[in-house]
Amino acid sequence: MTLTVRVISPDKTVWDAEADEVILPSTTGQLGILSGHAPLLTALDTGVLRVRTSKSQNWQAIALLGGFAEVEEDEVTILVNGGERGDTINLEEARTAYSQAQTKLNQVPAGDRQAQIQANQAFKRARARFQAAGGLA
């Protein structure tokens, strides 16, 4: 048995294919989904979705910018604020953005809560893109 996996962002369908396994970046940690999984609705954090396809048995990475996932009857529907397949991300650009976001996060003044939140979100986005592109394990 396989899963039907759809990743949908406001402006495009990021992924629509069969898969053997999915690993979701939920707000409470990584969540593995296999065929026959119990029905589930969960919030997703900014991070990397990993999909193991039936055809190649290779893992495909997709950077997600938060959203929700629903699992029901071997169908995984993922609605995200933004998503980008790892194989479409330029690794060097992602590496540069990750490094810059990390530097900015480290330079935020300790008392500026709003700046800390914004820098942390930018860092999480940059890290997800860099990981999906293959830059971080």
From Swiss-Prot:
Family under the similarity heading: Belongs to the ATPase epsilon chain family.
Keyword Transcription: no
Subunit field text: F-type ATPases have 2 components, CF(1) - the catalytic core - and CF(0) - the membrane proton channel. CF(1) has five subunits: alpha(3), beta(3), gamma(1), delta(1), epsilon(1). CF(0) has three main subunits: a, b and c.
Gene behind this protein: atpC
Assigned keywords, A-Z: ATP synthesis, CF(1), Hydrogen ion transport, Ion transport, Membrane, Thylakoid, Transport
Subcellular location: Cellular thylakoid membrane
Membrane topology: Peripheral membrane protein
One Pfam family this sequence matches: ATP-synt_DE_N
Function per UniProt: Produces ATP from ADP in the presence of a proton gradient across the membrane.
Organism this protein belongs to: Nostoc sp. (strain PCC 7120 / SAG 25.82 / UTEX 2576)
GO CC terms, sorted: plasma membrane-derived thylakoid membrane; proton-transporting ATP synthase complex
Ion transport among keywords: yes
Gene Ontology molecular function: ATP binding; proton-transporting ATP synthase activity, rotational mechanism
Protein name: ATP synthase epsilon chain
Gene3D superfamilies hit by this protein: F0F1 ATP synthase delta/epsilon subunit, N-terminal, Helix hairpin bin
